[in-house]
Amino acid sequence: MNTKITNFSFDKKNLSLAEDIIKKYPPEGKRSAILPLLDLAQRQNGGWLPVPAIEYVANMLEMPYMRAYEVATFYTMFNLKPVGKNHIQVCTTTPCWLRGSDDIMKTCKEKLGIKDEEVTKDQKFSLIEIECLGACVNAPVVQINDDYYEDLTPEKMEAIIDKLRND
């Protein structure tokens, strides 16, 4: 996985999509497109945002790089280093912890053979402990890429990993 990216630009399809996104905002408020454009850049780049992608989006929105960087570092949906094909985010905030998220995290570490904030050697999985996913009523909760998995047990988590491993 190339972590030394020195240049970034949207491909033709994403550039058109980015322009359509920006048009949804008034000209004086186009900076408000920062979240969807960073997300678009991250998706184009395999699930993470290198500095050149953040710079590119900031320039496109005519805003200082540092403002775009602040947004990218504030939200856990943005990854500033490479992640696996299946990016597993385990919520460990109090409601999830009370319902066993520590066991879910332990299961993931043991099953994948990695620690928090690591990627498996085959780059199929990455694991990170995060704060609230906003689904406390169904704790413990894990987000894998764009999907939520709720009311988990260690056994259910193992089955999910096995299924993803075989996909």
From Swiss-Prot:
This enzyme's EC code(s): 7.1.1.-
Organism encoding this protein: Rickettsia bellii (strain RML369-C)
Matching PROSITE patterns: COMPLEX1_24K
Keywords assigned: 2Fe-2S, Iron, Iron-sulfur, Metal-binding, NAD, Quinone, Translocase
Cofactor: how and how many bound: Binds 1 [2Fe-2S] cluster.
Catalysed reaction equations from the record: a quinone + NADH + 5 H(+)(in) = a quinol + NAD(+) + 4 H(+)(out)
Protein family according to the UniProt entry: Belongs to the complex I 24 kDa subunit family.
Function (record text): NDH-1 shuttles electrons from NADH, via FMN and iron-sulfur (Fe-S) centers, to quinones in the respiratory chain. Couples the redox reaction to proton translocation (for every two electrons transferred, four hydrogen ions are translocated across the cytoplasmic membrane), and thus conserves the redox energy in a proton gradient.
An MF annotation (GO) of this entry: NADH dehydrogenase activity
Cofactor(s) needed by this chain: [2Fe-2S] cluster
Residues annotated to bind [2Fe-2S] cluster: C91, C96, C132, C136
Signal peptide: none
UniProt name for this protein: NADH-quinone oxidoreductase subunit E
Database matches in InterPro entries: NuoE-like, NuoE_dom, NuoE_N, Thioredoxin-like_sf
